[in-house]
Regions:
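PLP-dependent amino-acid enzyme catalytic core
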Residues: 1-362
Length: 362
């Protein structure tokens, strides 16, 4: 069954890498590896890598130093806080990014204000509030929360918007956030080498605004430019702005509005990061618009491993790359996708699980 699946060939602290051995034997005969971000800094998601790095870069710039001169002990010191002063970092989030910004602000002695979209659960709200941030749930979608946070930052003395998406005139901090995400990609690449794999033949990565996807795709496209992996971007079908943009021959970005209702809360973003899109449209092989059932199925696959394969706790936004890969390998109705991706007995597949059970009640 591939109901709701749409795809298009594009014409335009160390976390774990886990080998899914029996799943590999059953499917591609070679290997499927999962980069598991459920342990990152005890925050259950990769997002903190971007926000914390961008905040560090901003502080370094303001005090006239290079970030390399500010190890964590210095960056979090009272001496540097006095030199930099008091700032308020604003952001919008579906959960993980805002939690990372709040976590970093607390450790840097700064303030954080977080705006969350309509439909946000109490668990996600509480996770951010516990970090000492001012947090609210608004009656608008994610993209409108971004605009709200940006407007508030502009009106606040020493207010800074730390958002993992870019728009005209706002590009430096999103670029830093994407660079921060690069930590995860470099780890995965190194861990694959430790497992005897020079580099993956296929990379499946999820996208909301496309910042993580841009970081992942950009890394592999640059590092292995002579023989890059087949890059596949997975979106929630309710917020598939990148897929819709790829369908346009012009390559212009298409926005998706409305409530963006999906179980993949972290991917419920209807307006793409312009920086990320420049990378993705030039290097991604396939964009896929994925229904909720695909994510739910993959979450169950991770939770019920075959044989001695590791048990992985993956949230709805984290599991969809495996869901798409599994569908391409197993479903007869998706054999054209498998052929387009050239998945075969020689494939070494990397899937990214970006989060653990960030909302276990749900």
């Amino acid at each position: 069954m591939t109901e709701g699946l749409k795809w298009t060939v594009n014409h335009v602290a160390r976390s774990d890498d886990k080998h899914l051995e029996l799943m590999s034997e059953e499917n591609v005969k070679k290997s499927i590896h999962c980069k598991d971000e459920s342990y990152r800094f005890g925050l259950n998601a990769f997002k903190v890598l971007g926000g914390s790095y961008a905040m560090g870069r901003y502080i370094a710039k303001e005090v006239g130093k290079d970030i390399s001169e500010l190890p964590y002990a210095v960056l979090s010191s009272e001496e540097l806080r006095k030199e930099f002063g008091q700032a308020t970092f604003f952001t919008a989030t579906d959960g993980n990014h805002g939690r990372g910004v709040a976590w970093a602000a607390k450790r840097l002695g700064q303030k954080a204000v977080v705006r969350m979209p309509k439909g946000t659960t109490k668990t996600r709200f509480d996770n951010i509030a516990k970090e000492g941030a001012t947090v609210t749930i608004e009656e608008v979608n994610y993209d409108d929360c971004v605009r709200m946070a940006a407007a508030e930052a502009a009106k606040t003395e020493h207010g800074i918007i730390v958002q993992d998406t870019a728009w005209d005139g706002y590009e430096e901090i999103p670029s830093w956030i994407m660079q921060g995400y690069g930590t995860m990609v470099m780890e995965a690449d190194q861990q694959l080498k430790e497992a005897g794999i020079d580099h993956p033949t296929h990379v499946f990565v999820q996208a909301g605004v496309g910042s993580l996807a841009g970081a992942v795709v950009g890394y592999f496209a640059h590092k292995y430019k002579e023989n890059p992996p087949v890059m596949v971007v997975c979106e929630a079908s309710a917020a598939d702005c990148l897929y819709r943009s790829a369908m346009k021959e012009s390559g212009d970005l298409v926005n998706v509005g409305g409530d963006l209702q999906t179980i993949m809360a972290g991917l419920a973003c209807g307006e793409a990061n312009t920086i990320g899109w420049d990378i993705l449209r030039n290097h991604v092989s396939v964009f896929a618009s994925c229904p909720d059932w695909m994510s739910a199925k993959a979450t169950r696959i991770y939770a019920n491993p075959l044989g001695n394969d590791p048990h992985i706790v993956s949230g709805e936004s984290g599991s969809v790359p495996l869901g798409l890969c599994f569908t391409a390998l197993h479903d007869e109705d998706a054999k054209d996708l498998k052929e387009a991706l050239k998945l075969d007995e020689n494939s070494n597949v990397l899937v990214i699980s970006t989060e653990g059970d960030t909302d276990p009640v749900r």
